[in-house]
């Protein structure tokens, strides 16, 4: 697995910002709740002062549907992790965890062993922002990996990962930043780690149409789709994290199947708009849909 799997602070903070904005919504309207997101966001007090509606309105002016897209991804993974842990899955590995807060904000069973994998400096920064009692949960282990002389496999096993136990792995918002070879290598290593037990793998990826025909990744009538696509990519490159890899559904399915995984679900914001936002009266119209990422859940075939 490549060191480039790990993102810099800007991306992790940007996702945490959207979680904070969503948390400011009325309880009966919000899709996710993250009481810790403000700890990771610069200017959190200003965002709180502005409130949910104004922040979302501003986001819609810049890139319509962007906030909802990231929140739907967060909720999709939340549901996946909760469902698997409730059904008896014993371990949860968060690859490139960044400022992920699921170990703290979701009501997961204490029997679920959680491993957060990231670079040492990222983990140190994250832990310094959390209350001490949350930074030292008994069922949670921080797995720091320095790829100059360590591997994911050895560090996970050294941290207590049990290769005989069922596991959920999540790789959220990362695939577009790393080479296709690095992604394949990561999946291969995960598959080898869990060949004696069942495993579920979540991955998000950016459609190859976003690179070839960006308008196809937006809803009908979306304003200035190509311009917005360039804005998204420019913003990421500006903070030193350019998007370099795009995939078709067939390509993702092939790389997963090569390593023993079968795709069970592949959805976009269009699917999750009706699943999450419509029931609380916040459904986006067709011309607000941003479908640049696909969210995939795959299961091992062993």
Where are the regions that the model predicts?
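A short, conserved alpha-helix within the catalytic core of class I
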Residues: 151-154, 177-196
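Conserved SAM/SAH-binding loop
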Residues: 146-149
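Short acidic/polar active-site loop segments enriched in Thr and Asp
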Residues: 90, 199, 262
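Conserved beta-strand signature within the Rossmann-like core of class I S-adenosyl-L-methionine
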Residues: 168, 192-209
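Rossmann-like AdoMet/SAM-dependent catalytic core
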Residues: 8-10, 210-302
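A short SAM/SAH-binding and catalytic strip from SAM-dependent methyltransferases
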Residues: 159-182
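Rossmann-like AdoMet
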Residues: 1-93, 99-143, 163
């Amino acid at each position: 697995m490549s060191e480039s799997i790990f993102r810099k602070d800007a991306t992790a903070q940007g996702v945490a910002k959207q979680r904070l904005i969503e948390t400011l919504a009325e309880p009966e309207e919000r899709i996710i709740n993250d009481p810790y997101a403000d700890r990771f966001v610069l200017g959190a007090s200003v965002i709180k002062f502005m409130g949910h509606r104004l922040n979302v309105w501003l986001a819609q002016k810049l890139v319509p549907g962007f906030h909802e897209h990231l929140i739907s991804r967060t909720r999709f993974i939340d549901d996946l992790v909760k469902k698997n842990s409730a059904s008896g899955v014993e371990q949860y590995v968060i690859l490139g965890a960044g400022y992920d807060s699921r170990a703290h904000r979701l009501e997961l069973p204490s029997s679920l062993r959680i491993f957060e994998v990231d670079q040492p400096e990222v983990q140190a920064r994250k832990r310094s922002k959390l209350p001490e009692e949350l930074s030292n949960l008994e069922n949670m282990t921080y797995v720091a990996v320095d790829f100059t002389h360590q591997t994911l496999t050895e560090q996970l096993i050294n941290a207590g990962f049990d290769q005989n136990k069922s596991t959920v792995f999540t790789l959220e918002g990362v695939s577009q930043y790393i080479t296709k070879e690095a992604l394949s290598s990561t999946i291969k290593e995960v598959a080898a780690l869990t060949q004696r037990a069942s495993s579920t793998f979540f991955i998000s990826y950016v459609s190859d149409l976003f690179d070839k025909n960006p308008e196809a990744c937006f809803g009908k009538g979306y304003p200035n789709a190509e311009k917005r696509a360039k804005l998204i990519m420019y913003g990421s490159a500006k903070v030193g994290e350019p998007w370099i890899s795009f995939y078709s559904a067939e390509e993702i399915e092939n790389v997963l199947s090569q390593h023993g995984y079968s795709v069970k679900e592949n959805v976009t914001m269009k699917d999750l708009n009706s699943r999450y936002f419509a029931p609380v009266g916040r459904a986006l119209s067709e011309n607000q849909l941003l479908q640049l990422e696909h969210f995939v859940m795959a299961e091992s075939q062993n």
